[in-house]
Regions:
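Hydrophobic transmembrane signal anchors and adjacent membrane-proximal interface regions, especially
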Residues: 11, 72-73, 117, 139
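Glycine-rich/acidic phosphate-handling loop/turn and adjacent ATP-lid/helix
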Residues: 42-111
Length: 143
């Protein structure tokens, strides 16, 4: 819920808030669930299938190993662009395979958030090498 509220607030600083909010929300969700809470893709698939996803998220949030981790967010605006940087305290991941919709995951019950953010919300997504920090950039259109 905190992530959704912050996403809605930050989206207002982008030229198309309705598009930006989707990407910001998805990137926040990934930072918390897959980054700080260290829930891998396959486990999330199984937890959703057996209807225990929310229970596992709550359990990990209460676990000091994961629950004390934070997501850091910064916003930067220049004459050329607007950018949001999201950093989590997780181990990182191999982000490249998620930048575009993979037909092999098309029927999965999750796993399209990064591709949606990349295609709909930002002109560019840049991850650090480790995969625990992403910057979403929207370039200003010249009139």
């Amino acid at each position: 819920e905190e992530g959704d509220n912050l996403a809605a607030f930050l989206a207002q600083f982008f030229p198309s808030p309705d598009l930006a909010i989707t990407g910001i929300s998805e990137l926040f969700l990934n930072a918390v669930e897959h980054g700080n809470l260290a829930i891998p893709y396959e486990l999330k698939s199984e937890l959703i299938r057996v209807n225990r996803w929310k229970e596992e998220v709550e359990r990990r949030l209460a676990d000091p190993l994961y629950g004390r981790r934070v997501v850091t967010v910064s916003y930067r605006r220049s004459s050329e662009s607007m950018a949001i940087r999201i950093h989590d305290e997780g181990e990182g991941f191999d982000w490249e395979r998620y930048l575009h919709v993979d037909p092999s995951r098309a029927t999965h019950n999750h796993g399209r958030g990064i591709a949606m953010a990349n295609m709909m919300s930002f002109d560019e997504l840049i991850y650090n090498d480790r995969g625990n920090e992403v910057t979403g950039i929207v370039y200003r259109r010249k009139s």
